[in-house]
């Protein structure tokens, strides 16, 4: 399983978890309310709370329960098999997500802790699924030597930017920021970059080798401390910009010994192919559930 695919799965899992939590909270909060309560009217006709909750359960009930089962299955079997994941292992994979894959975004819905919890879950799941697969040290070293770019990164800067049409407006932006306005809010309101403005101007982690990033951004970022923004407008091809440095990561290369367990899981998961799914563990965990027969086939 390719590295970028793994992070896509993590991203998808986090999204599903957000939906599941929202659904569970909504249903629990509604427990004390009347099921016949009208929560909306359309042309004089009501939508009742009961109808709404049924629709929510039809759409999310099965997937929510399945996610809850999956987490418990992995936790129980990991404990049974005495699998333990170190904090350093989770931190390393999280660092690679940020710097190499540029996939990390933290917002009000998904925090750094939630990312790390999902990474820990994925590592445990992959360890369980691949526990009976042996990969020689020679094969692991060969993979590492052929794919070193997956385990190293240059100095990286997580940058936000606000792009406006002219220098005058850029200076107005600076006044707003100095007056206490948040960078994210001003970016959402003023930036002409429609791809990043909904995300507070977040460009993710960039390096000197990044495509489509003005070299002036990198040079300015080198002079800034985290959370500081540029004090003068930066001339760019489509106007003027103000940037903010959110985080800086120093260049690093992980050694073979540091990542060999991760490589073993990657190769073993590739060998499993479509069989690499948590549902293959349900029978071992003796699962029975509302939507199906006991355990799975």
Curated annotation (Swiss-Prot):
Gene3D superfamilies: 3.10.50.40, Porin chaperone SurA, peptide-binding domain. Residues 154-247 form the PpiC domain. The keyword Secreted does not apply. Its EC number is 5.2.1.8. Keywords: Isomerase, Rotamase, Signal. Residues 1-32 form the signal peptide. One of its GO terms (molecular function) is peptidyl-prolyl cis-trans isomerase activity. SUPFAM superfamilies: FKBP-like, Triger factor/SurA peptide-binding domain-like. Pfam families: Rotamase_2 (PF13145), SurA_N_3 (PF13624). It catalyses: [protein]-peptidylproline (omega=180) = [protein]-peptidylproline (omega=0). It comes from the Bacteria. PANTHER family: FOLDASE PROTEIN PRSA, PEPTIDYLPROLYL ISOMERASE. This is Putative peptidyl-prolyl cis-trans isomerase YacD.
């Amino acid at each position: 399983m390719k590295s970028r695919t793994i992070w896509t799965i993590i991203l998808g899992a986090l999204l599903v978890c957000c939906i599941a939590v929202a659904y569970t909270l909504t249903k629990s909060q509604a427990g004390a309310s009347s099921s016949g309560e009208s929560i909306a009217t359309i042309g004089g006709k009501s939508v009742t709370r009961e109808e709404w909750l049924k629709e929510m359960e039809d759409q999310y009930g099965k997937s929510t329960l399945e996610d809850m089962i999956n987490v418990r299955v992995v936790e129980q079997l990991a404990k049974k098999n005495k699998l333990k994941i170190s904090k350093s292992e989770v931190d390393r994979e999280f660092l690679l997500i940020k710097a190499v894959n540029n996939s990390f975004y933290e917002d009000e819905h998904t925090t750094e802790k939630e990312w790390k919890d999902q990474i820990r879950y994925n590592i445990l799941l992959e360890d369980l699924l691949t526990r009976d697969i042996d990969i020689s040290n020679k094969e692991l070293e060969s993979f590492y030597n052929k794919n070193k770019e997956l385990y190293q990164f240059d100095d990286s800067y997580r940058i936000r930017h606000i792009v406006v049409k002219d220098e005058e407006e850029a200076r107005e932006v600076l006044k707003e920021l100095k007056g206490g306005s948040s960078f994210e809010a001003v970016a959402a309101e003023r930036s002409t970059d429609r791809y990043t403005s909904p995300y507070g101007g977040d460009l993710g982690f960039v390096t000197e080798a990044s495509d489509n990033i003005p070299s002036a951004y990198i040079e300015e970022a080198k002079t800034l401390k985290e959370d500081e923004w540029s004090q003068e407008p930066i001339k760019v091809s489509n106007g003027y910009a103000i940037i903010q440095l959110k985080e800086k990561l120093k260049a690093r290369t992980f050694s073979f010994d540091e990542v060999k367990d991760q490589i073993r899981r990657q190769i073993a998961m590739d060998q499993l192919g479509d069989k690499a799914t948590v549902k293959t563990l349900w029978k071992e965990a003796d699962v029975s559930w509302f939507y199906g027969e006991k355990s799975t086939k």
